[in-house]
């Protein structure tokens, strides 16, 4: 249990280091208005904090910097609330006042605004295609033998497949099948389509469509969408401005992680709990992120989680500001998507 003096000193050290990037010494602390005790007491308390693992000494300065344990305690217990400026709020809300009709574009814009406001790297994980729901399906004949199947989901995701038509199938059968599919499958999650086709659609197609077997195989193949969730990255170069990554080896390690989309995708999929989550340094359990913090939030539609928004920065991150910005973006994105889905 830390004493009140130790809590005060730890908070000031973390706040100062986040702001300046410079180690904090006892002389700097003694000049703070909040500090009313002697320099000797400051040094003793700093020594105790160091022994407890909350701060550590750098090789190039007599000052101290927060350790990972210190940052963790700060985020969990000492984080001051931050009120966003009106300009920040208006900048974020401007995204959702634009006439954007595609989920992908709305997510990309959210990622860009967030990276601009934080000066860190922003990653937004869209919903997995299999979590989308079917909105419409069209089959447009190209000639007597081929057609293009167009699948549109409730999120605006569009996928096209060129398919082979059965020999001599009447155009009226193609039209009938499209009507049956849209009537029976609209609103069904893509991951449930195969079962739904077998249990509820197959017998209807058998009654109304010639070459029923061929058409059923064709449409089942078209609806087998295995694309992973889309990942949108913005502000990657912002990390170059952080003094922590002036070391080329550290920077290369971080960029390798970002470039390995599967690894980063796996990392974000782990952070899918509701609310704000903060992972600091080695808590991310990824080599190369020892000097990074990852703050995540989920966005949803009508209470159903749809995706994840994350801000990646140095452990010396402006936690209060980033959390406030991230929370606002996630909340407003969820509201916008809920209204959009309800309208449809």
Curated annotation (Swiss-Prot):
Molecular function via GO: DNA binding
InterPro entries: GAF-like_dom_sf, HrcA, HrcA_C, WH-like_DNA-bd_sf, WH_DNA-bd_sf, WHTH_transcript_rep_HrcA_IDD
Keywords for the protein's UniProt record, in alphabetical order: Repressor, Stress response, Transcription, Transcription regulation
KW Cell cycle (keyword) present: no
GO biological process: negative regulation of DNA-templated transcription
Pfam families referenced in this protein's UniProt entry, alphabetically: HrcA
Family recorded in the similarity comment: Belongs to the HrcA family.
Functional description taken from the UniProt entry: Negative regulator of class I heat shock genes (grpE-dnaK-dnaJ and groELS operons). Prevents heat-shock induction of these operons.
NCBIfam families in alphabetical order: hrcA
Protein name from the UniProt record: Heat-inducible transcription repressor HrcA
Source organism: Anoxybacillus flavithermus (strain DSM 21510 / WK1)
């Amino acid at each position: 249990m830390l004493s009140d003096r130790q809590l005060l000193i730890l908070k000031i050290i973390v706040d100062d280091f986040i702001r300046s990037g410079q180690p904090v010494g006892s002389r700097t602390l003694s000049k703070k208005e909040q500090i009313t005790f002697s320099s000797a007491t400051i040094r003793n308390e700093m020594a105790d904090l160091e022994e407890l693992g909350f701060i550590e000494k750098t090789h190039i300065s007599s000052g101290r910097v927060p350790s990972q344990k210190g940052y963790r305690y700060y985020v969990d217990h000492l984080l001051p609330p931050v009120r966003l400026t009106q300009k920040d709020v208006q900048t974020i809300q401007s995204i959702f006042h634009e006439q954007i009709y595609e989920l992908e574009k709305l997510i990309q814009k959210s990622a860009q605004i967030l990276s601009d406001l934080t000066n860190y790297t922003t990653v937004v994980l869209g919903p997995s295609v299999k979590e989308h729901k079917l909105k419409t399906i069209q089959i447009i004949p190209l000639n007597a033998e081929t057609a293009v199947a167009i699948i549109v989901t409730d999120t605006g995701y569009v996928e096209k497949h060129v398919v082979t038509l059965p020999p001599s199938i009447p155009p009226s059968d193609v039209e009938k099948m499209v009507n049956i599919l849209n009537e029976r499958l609209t609103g069904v999650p893509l991951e449930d389509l195969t079962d739904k086709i077998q249990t509820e659609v197959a017998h209807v197609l058998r009654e109304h469509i010639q070459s029923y077997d061929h058409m059923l195989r064709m449409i089942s193949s078209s609806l087998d969408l295995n694309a992973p969730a889309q990942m949108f990255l913005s502000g990657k170069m912002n990390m170059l401005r952080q003094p922590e990554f002036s070391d080329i080896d550290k920077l290369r390690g971080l960029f390798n992680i970002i470039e390995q989309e599967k690894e980063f995708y796996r990392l974000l999929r782990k952070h899918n709990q509701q609310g704000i989550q903060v992972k600091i340094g080695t808590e991310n359990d990824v080599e190369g992120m020892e000097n990074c913090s990852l703050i995540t939030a989920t966005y949803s539609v009508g209470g159903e989680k749809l995706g994840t928004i994350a801000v990646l920065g140095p452990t010396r991150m402006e936690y209060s500001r980033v959390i406030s910005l991230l929370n606002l973006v996630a909340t407003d994105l969820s509201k916008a998507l809920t209204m959009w889905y309800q309208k449809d």
